[in-house]
């Protein structure tokens, strides 16, 4: 398990009532793979009303090292402001390297808000995300970085934090 503030991989889990959505389960699987490749922890976030004790068994089996559960009035159904505040405050403290969100109505609303608030990178509509080599010829160094496949655009790479 990685130590605190090691730029872990995070997955934002979408829920409907107390049911974790399939897109989040898929992202947890990919998140575990990326975390293993990077040698960091996989953390998951879920926010809703009346969810504590009802969502953990749906999320933890995916190899999540730490689960952040935010349970309170006004967190379900989803609205932008409280969920953005939760993620921005958490990410300021935890400093994730990557946060995966679904390409859903919620993910497309929340991702840009969090990214803008933190002035971080945002890569939308990825169909593939992997760790690969990046050669900085100017500084004669090679880094492991993110390679991602975007619908209809092709392949690109990024060395900065991506949400």
Pin down the residues of each PLM region.
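N-terminal glycine-rich FAD/FM-binding segment characteristic of electron-transfer flavoproteins
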Residues: 1-161
């Amino acid at each position: 398990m990685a130590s605190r503030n090691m730029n872990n991989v995070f997955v934002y889990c979408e829920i409907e009532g107390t049911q974790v959505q399939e897109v989040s389960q898929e992202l947890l699987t990919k998140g575990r793979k990326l975390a293993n490749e990077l040698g960091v922890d996989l953390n998951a976030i879920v926010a809703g009303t009346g969810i504590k004790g009802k969502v953990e068994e749906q999320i933890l089996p995916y190899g999540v090292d730490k689960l952040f559960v935010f349970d309170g009035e006004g967190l379900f159904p989803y609205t932008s402001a409280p969920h953005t505040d939760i993620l921005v405050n958490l990410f300021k403290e935890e400093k994730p390297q990557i946060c995966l969100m679904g390409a859903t109505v919620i993910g497309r609303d929340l991702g840009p808000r969090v990214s803008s608030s933190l002035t971080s990178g945002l890569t939308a509509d990825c169909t593939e995300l992997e760790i690969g080599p990046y050669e900085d010829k100017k500084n004669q160094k090679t880094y492991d970085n993110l390679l991602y496949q975007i619908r209809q655009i092709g392949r690109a790479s990024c060395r900065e934090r991506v949400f």
